[in-house]
């Protein structure tokens, strides 16, 4: 507990906010180019082949981004839009690729939560 005199001399230090997605530099999304597209296995209780991409953003930083949805058309040199948001069972994956934007096509035959996966409304 500081004294009044210490507060007058130094004041209170503001609490520094640490960004959850520092590579985006405060932007909601950022464009990038896929460097590697591969699959990885998740942490302990889960088992799958999760699709991820290593993306070089326009600011020069390289991040690992998750590719959501079933099936994708991404390959090396694909231009993608990246947003923040981690994948809990993949350590080090703190970004997601936005489906239906730039080179990332929307998920085919998607009926529910379509806007999240860039899918058009199906014909009756």
Swiss-Prot record:
Assembly and binders: Part of the 30S ribosomal subunit. Contacts proteins S8 and S17. May interact with IF1 in the 30S initiation complex.
Annotated SUPFAM superfamilies: Nucleic acid-binding proteins
HAMAP family: Ribosomal_uS12_B
Species per Swiss-Prot/TrEMBL record: Thermoanaerobacter pseudethanolicus (strain ATCC 33223 / 39E)
Gene Ontology cellular component terms for the protein in this record: small ribosomal subunit
Residues of the signal peptide: none
Function: With S4 and S5 plays an important role in translational accuracy.
Keywords attached to this entry: Methylation, Ribonucleoprotein, Ribosomal protein, RNA-binding, rRNA-binding, tRNA-binding
Lineage start: Bacteria, Bacillati, Bacillota, Clostridia, Thermoanaerobacterales
An example Gene Ontology biological process: translation
Record PTM 3-methylthioaspartic acid, positions in chain: 89
Protein name: Small ribosomal subunit protein uS12
Annotated GO MF terms: rRNA binding; structural constituent of ribosome; tRNA binding
């Amino acid at each position: 507990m500081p004294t009044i005199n210490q507060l007058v001399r130094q004041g209170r230090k503001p609490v520094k906010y640490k960004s959850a997605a520092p590579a985006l530099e405060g932007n909601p999304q950022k464009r990038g180019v896929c460097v590697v597209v591969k699959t990885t296995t998740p942490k302990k209780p889960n088992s799958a082949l999760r699709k991820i991409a290593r993306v070089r953003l326009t600011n020069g930083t390289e991040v690992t981004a998750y590719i959501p949805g079933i099936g994708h058309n991404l390959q090396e040199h694909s231009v993608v839009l990246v947003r923040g948001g981690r994948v809990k069972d993949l350590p080090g994956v703190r970004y997601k690729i936005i489906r239906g934007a730039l080179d990332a096509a929307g998920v085919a035959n998607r009926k529910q939560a379509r806007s999240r996966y860039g899918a058009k409304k199906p014909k009756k």
